[in-house]
């Protein structure tokens, strides 16, 4: 069995601890926009439309359809407080660390971890490099909860309705368009819970 474990599978544990998994802090690297013909892709002379999914639960503000125009790479999700509150500490643990670019290694998807939100999260998997792992590992010295097992660096491109045919068609197109593309890092993003 190769199922991705998630803290969301143990929701009652975190409720008992008084921890809202949707309100944890996050440090991200903003990247240049991912330019793609997202909404219309011609395939065999047929225009395919990819319906966006936007969160029903407004606490999940980040689930907002096409997000490739304002992309980020999560360096660490799960701080016990908003990353802005840890800014001085983050600057200390990341002192001397810098990334200028990342490379798209593949295109894939994640299933929604929320039973009440049925969508696919279409992502650009990022090539894992020593410098990227170092940044992530430095941040792990700060108080946090791992909400998923292992670090899977990715940039979210879009949240789409849960339809396997649409998902697979979109992924096939994006692979041909984006794999191997380098994305410029625009800076740190300390996030925030709207």
Which role does the model predict for each range below?
Residues 2-194:
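Histidine-dependent nucleotide/RNA phosphoesterase domain, centered on the 2H-phosphoesterase fold
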